[in-house]
Swiss-Prot record:
Domain of life the protein comes from: Viruses
Main location: host cell
Biological processes annotated in GO: DNA replication; DNA-templated transcription; regulation of DNA replication; viral DNA genome replication
Function: Plays a role in the initiation of viral DNA replication. A dimer of E2 interacts with a dimer of E1 in order to improve specificity of E1 DNA binding activity. Once the complex recognizes and binds DNA at specific sites, the E2 dimer is removed from DNA. E2 also regulates viral transcription through binding to the E2RE response element (5'-ACCNNNNNNGGT-3') present in multiple copies in the regulatory regions of the viral genome. Activates or represses transcription depending on E2RE's position with regards to proximal promoter elements including the TATA-box.
Organism of provenance: Human papillomavirus 11
Protein name: Regulatory protein E2
Length: 367
């Protein structure tokens, strides 16, 4: 047990160093997935030995560590393959190479620089869904990789590989889930595209960049026949609350990148307003950490090891379960005995740039 504990500590220390470094080098992210793989192997072995805890860390069930290990192997192999091509020298962030991004439609390919497309179903301003059009999509074709861009038309969102068009969002299928009249309007930038059933004229096609180019990596010539034309359906995106309906107006979607670096966020509104509220005299000061689940676990381990005197309690990692949740990140909540202790924590502890943190109060009475 002692040998496993030492190797696990070293592995998690290296993971946290990688998170704090926040590199854009693809080889650092390959190392990151190697560490995740080793961590899963150690936890799997510990569970087979009958251990339920290693220090403060709970040993997960065998199926959990096995699945996580398989995911790490998958990501490591694909990143190593991509690193050998001309695209390996491009900047790659932890978010770009995360397993969550890997499974984001279109699934099992790398993607960068996402822009939002809003689709209004049944002409209802309150029934608007958001989808992502990617500026760069990296597809594996046998031993080589190709880089394409995605576009949107009245049918859905697609990318073109060679002469084959693949839809990864089908608006007709989405309309069957979120609408009742099989009518939708696509708002992209300052352009509105209506569903084929609502117009008789030819629907205009919009691309997010220049005309789609088929750019194979220089390692080996790709085989176009490997690209499929199966329609993919995305997971239900977040539904946005809309204001009152406005007729005969041009629909303008705010374009924002989902691939930008996330900076630390500390809200100071409580300094201006909430401190004046007497109800906070009985509330518990907290800091809410948001980010990758494994990154949060490593960071919490370091906090318990080196900074336990700067906070009271640390929660397990948790997620919002509602489909309307504002994000899918894991969350860890830290509590403090006073606002002064919390401020001392924020002044003393370096929070990795991949973790967002917000301050607030918890009105529940802790036992």
């Amino acid at each position: 047990m002692e040998a496993i504990a030492k190797r696990l500590d070293a592995c998690q220390d290296q993971l946290l160093e990688l998170y704090e470094e926040n590199s854009i080098d693809i080889h650092k992210h390959i190392m990151h997935w190697k560490c995740i793989r080793l961590e899963s192997v150690l936890l799997h072995k510990a569970k087979q030995m009958g251990l339920s805890h290693i220090g403060l860390q709970v040993v997960p069930p065998l199926t959990v560590s096995e699945t996580k290990g398989h995911n790490a192997i998958e990501m490591q192999m694909h990143l190593e393959s991509l690193a050998k091509t001309q695209y390996g020298v491009e900047p790659w962030t932890l978010q770009d190479t995360s397993y969550e991004m890997w499974l984001t439609p279109p699934k099992r390919c790398f993607k960068k620089q996402g822009n939002t497309v809003e689709v209004k179903f049944d002409g209802c301003e309150d029934n608007v869904m958001e989808y992502v059009v990617w500026t760069h999509i990296y597809l594996q074709d046998n031993d080589s990789w190709v880089k394409v861009t995605s576009s949107v038309d009245a049918k859905g969102i697609y990318y073109t590989c060679g002469q084959f068009k693949t839809y990864y969002v089908n608006f007709n299928k989405e309309a069957q889930k979120y609408g009742s009249t099989n009518h939708w309007e696509v708002c992209y930038g300052s352009t509105v595209i209506c569903s084929p059933a609502s117009v008789s004229s030819t629907v205009r096609e919009v691309s997010i960049a220049e005309p789609t180019t088929y750019t194979p990596a220089q390692t080996t010539a790709p085989t176009v026949s490997a690209c499929t034309t199966e329609d993919g359906v995305s997971a239900p995106p977040r539904k946005r609350a809309r204001g009152p309906s406005t007729n005969n107006t041009l629909c303008v979607a705010n374009i924002r990148s989902v691939d930008s670096t996330i900076n630390n966020i500390v809200t100071d509104n409580y300094n201006k307003h909430q401190r004046r509220n007497n109800c906070h005299s009985a509330a518990t000061p907290i800091v809410q950490l948001q980010g990758d689940s494994n990154c949060l676990k490593c960071f919490r381990y370091r906090l318990n090891d080196k900074y336990k005197h700067l906070f009271e309690l640390a929660s397990s990692t948790w997620h919002w379960a509602s489909p309307e949740a504002p994000h899918k990140n894991a969350i860890v909540t830290l509590t403090y005995s006073s606002e002064e202790q919390r401020q001392q924590f924020l002044n003393s502890v370096k929070i990795p740039p991949t973790i967002r943190h917000k301050v607030g109060f918890m009105s529940l009475h802790l036992l």
